């Protein structure tokens, strides 16, 4: 039970983190002068 919960939460955190990184990278490459995320 606990291991499944931990793995699920890790997957969710990783997916959100990677999505944020990709969005941030695209935003920087497209708008270098823009500072807001």
Curated annotation (Swiss-Prot):
Keywords: Cell inner membrane, Cell membrane, Membrane, Transmembrane, Transmembrane helix
Induction entry: Expressed approximately equally in exponential and stationary phases (at protein level).
GO cellular component, one term: plasma membrane
A Pfam family it matches: YnaM
KW Cell membrane (keyword) present: yes
Cited InterPro entries: YnaM_YnfT (IPR048193)
Membrane topology: Single-pass membrane protein
Compartments in which it is found: Cell inner membrane
Transmembrane segments: 4-24
Misc. comment: Encoded in the Rac prophage.
Name the record gives this protein: Protein YnaM
Organism, as annotated: Escherichia coli (strain K12)
Taxonomic lineage from the root: Bacteria, Pseudomonadati, Pseudomonadota, Gammaproteobacteria, Enterobacterales
């Amino acid at each position: 039970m606990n291991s499944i919960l931990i793995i699920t939460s890790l997957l969710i955190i990783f997916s959100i983190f990677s999505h944020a990184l990709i969005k941030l990278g695209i935003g920087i490459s497209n708008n270098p002068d823009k500072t807001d995320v």
